[in-house]
Amino acid sequence: MSNNKDVAIKSSGGKKIREARIKVRSDSLYNLTTAVEKLKSASYVKFDPTLEIVMKLGIDPRHSDQMVRGVVNLPAGTGKTVRVAVICKEEREEEAKVAGADLVGSTNIIDEIKAGKINFDVCIATPDMMAVIGSVARILGPKGLMPNPKLGTVTLDIKGAVKNAKSGQVEYRAEKAGIIHAGLGKLSFPDQDLLKNLKAFIDAVVKAKPTGVKGSYLKAIYLSSTMGASVQIDLASIA
């Protein structure tokens, strides 16, 4: 995706791509409603693409007091099937299973992780298991799967954590250059559902503004669809 242009087509050649270029303007900024409409009209892929958001923040992630990270419960969900693992002691395993966890256990899951068998998208753990999980932190950490109390994945509330993970909880984290990227639902969702997800996500990131940030916090917002167009949002329209 281009950092400076508000329209980018992530493929080359073909009649459909040329048609997509016509449906979005390279010299325009859009509000969220119009942006969603434009992306839908310009989508040409044969699968159901994901609505993606990229936010450029005026922060320096190298400073610990300017890290932006958290989770958002999307009102309309993500449209994806999420596999959840719960690492807990035996007496709470049945509770985790009833809650809907796909993988439940303790040392057996740790052994699978060490063997490279990671068959889950979210890992939840009870606090009393964190010492054991520490042995696989170097494996889970780089994959964004390490349980974290700040993200609600280290908790005594197994039922609530599993429900949140299954119903559309999305994690966000500012990367290099202050960029946040996330998928916020399928393009086939009704417009109003996508707008609810967008507003919930943007609001959460805005509220997560570090106190030490000087100057403009929101620098730019882009929306795109998988293998489709990218449009830039008019920041004044969401202020």
UniProtKB/Swiss-Prot annotation:
One of its GO terms (molecular function) is structural constituent of ribosome. The keyword RNA-binding applies. GO terms for cellular component: large ribosomal subunit. One of its GO terms (biological process) is regulation of translation. SUPFAM superfamilies: Ribosomal protein L1. It comes from the Bacteria. The keyword Ribosomal protein applies. Keywords: Repressor, Ribonucleoprotein, Ribosomal protein, RNA-binding, rRNA-binding, Translation regulation, tRNA-binding. Gene3D superfamilies: 3.30.190.20, 3.40.50.790. Transmembrane segments: none annotated. InterPro entries: Ribosom_uL1_bac-type, Ribosomal_uL1, Ribosomal_uL1-like, Ribosomal_uL1/biogenesis, Ribosomal_uL1_3-a/b-sand, Ribosomal_uL1_CS. Pfam families: Ribosomal_L1. HAMAP family: Ribosomal_uL1_B. Part of the 50S ribosomal subunit. Belongs to the universal ribosomal protein uL1 family. Binds directly to 23S rRNA. The L1 stalk is quite mobile in the ribosome, and is involved in E site tRNA release. This is Large ribosomal subunit protein uL1.
